[in-house]
Regions:
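Polytopic transmembrane helical bundles with strong interfacial aromatic enrichment
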Residues: 1-174
Length: 174
């Protein structure tokens, strides 16, 4: 039961990370239409909240799976391990994105905060166990996947706003 809960929380964490970090990457690189700024800010805010909640819940679930003892070994396994480092990066990056300024003059700061969130994949999971190179590849892979994920939301929003004639001109079925 706890394994299923941990998998669900991990999936929610991934959705949150793809949303919040990807929206920042898309906003910085795509020059989206002015109408799409609302969807990007929603993706950032909701993704940040989901990332923070899922990261904390995942840490709590891991604590319970390890026996829920408040001893040094259990707390070290949760907070002083690669899992704890990844959780700190996720919460710090998402918190800075959520509570930081979000105008055009702070774009570089937003990018660095989003990179903090995706850098957590270099410290946790199979890639971290394989070494530094695999961790960097995982970090880049997740960053690009997040950009792609949010870029599709921007494209979907732009197509919905353009109307059926503009979408029909692209050749996509409506």
């Amino acid at each position: 039961m706890l394994d299923a809960l941990a998998a669900l929380l991990k999936a929610l964490l991934y959705v949150g990370i793809l949303s919040c970090a990807g929206a920042v990457f898309a906003q910085a690189t795509l020059r989206p239409p002015f109408d799409s700024s609302h969807i990007l800010s929603q993706l950032i805010r909701r993704g940040c909240v989901l990332t923070i909640c899922a990261a904390l819940a995942s840490a709590g679930c891991l604590f319970i799976r390890l026996g829920a003892e408040f001893d040094i070994a259990t707390l070290s396994a949760v907070f002083l391990s690669n899992t704890g480092a990844a959780m700190c990066l996720q919460i710090a990056g998402a918190g800075l994105l959520l509570f930081g300024a979000s105008d055009a003059s702070t774009r570089a700061t937003q990018l660095s905060n989003a990179l903090l969130v995706t850098a957590s994949f270099a410290f946790n999971g199979h890639a971290a166990a394989d070494g530094l190179t695999a961790g960097i590849v995982a970090f880049l892979h997740v960053s690009l996947a997040a950009w792609w994920f949010s870029s599709l939301w921007v494209l979907r929003d732009a197509c919905a706003r353009a109307g059926s004639t503009a979408v029909a001109a692209t050749g996509w079925p409506s």
